[in-house]
């Protein structure tokens, strides 16, 4: 399910009056996070904050929290509260891996892809971009520009979110279960 953004922000102790940009690159915290952590806070509008999820990458977490952070940045290590962070966010910068993209898609969270691994992730990029659900940029400067462009044009984010909500069902497990039960009923009689 999806928690209302204001409630998610309250639960996570994030400012209620700020839009959340979520930055994550999988459980290992890879990708251009350091460059983005330095550049993006300088460019974000005043009504936005950057939440960086480092995952299991303790070295990255320590390097990002070694010095005082700007007021518009939060750095999180490993967390079991990813669904809440996604519910609080307006945009996620993430690798186009299967789990992250599926969870974001089901939640209707627009995606900006970074640091793709050739193969499966390339297909994910093609699929989501061709369906109007995501975008991609190469390099930290281009990513920062894209984030600011999207935040300045909420209608683009809303359109991506609506497309995701229309195209992706959060109840896939229920549909599969119902199909199996129906098929079993046909083959074996009423269960």
What are these regions (language model features)?
Residues 140-144, 170-181:
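Short, amphipathic alpha-helical "lid/cap" segments that border enzyme active or binding sites
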